[in-house]
């Protein structure tokens, strides 16, 4: 999330809109790469400073893994998503993993070679990023140009506002396990985690649809098509919901190896999220952000976060089911807010 810093939404929109206007595309790519390069240097400085100031075990591992962080920050996945060529992202990820596996087989033979792992992992990531930048510059003839400071600041501020909304979303998603572990029990965390993964798997097709449609809608501003897709995806989500409920006992038995039976009930409770997610995913980036309603997008996320904080106060009083109910309430409110904003 920190590596993306909101550019996976804002930069994708800009690239999609101006992919055929060469000077604007050069300005967008240059601004984003300059910002991300400075951001990368800043993060590396923080890492080195922290390692020097604090007594951190295995310092060398942190340093060696930093190559992967650099690759993640500089990887132009946002560019390829914007021009609707996601196949390249798949190719680059495949190349990274392939290079990593080959190098690992060649160089790692015992526990004493453990430092090779982060080195090779970083090399694989850096190779994929370098190849991605090469394709962007050579095949699509993108050029780095001088950019006015106000344009750089503008893109940074807009991406930062999206990053803040992502923070709210991340807190909502990640803090459930922390609260359950601290106030209810680690066993419940395990049940919740398995059930949540099954439900998220059910939402995965809609997430992919969001990634594919967002740049197309941002480029063509074809919101009528988007609403047709939403109607279809809504009924598909209901079908997946039914399958999730039907197959929950089998899925929990398979993934939990017969030890996580209480997760079945949690899947039943959380499975309606598949339907609400189908609306939230497609109303958020593809409609609100594509139409330029960044403020409405951010406000909706922080309103949901406020409701989440209010609901979490009851975790101390009640139990796991209170937590699950609060998640459903938050998603329903978020869904209604997105729908209201999109209708306006």
Per-range role (PLM):
Residues 51-65, 246-277, 325:
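Interfacial segments at transmembrane-helix termini and the short loops linking adjacent helices
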Residues 36, 65, 93-97, 118-122, ...:
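Residue-level recognition of transmembrane alpha-helices
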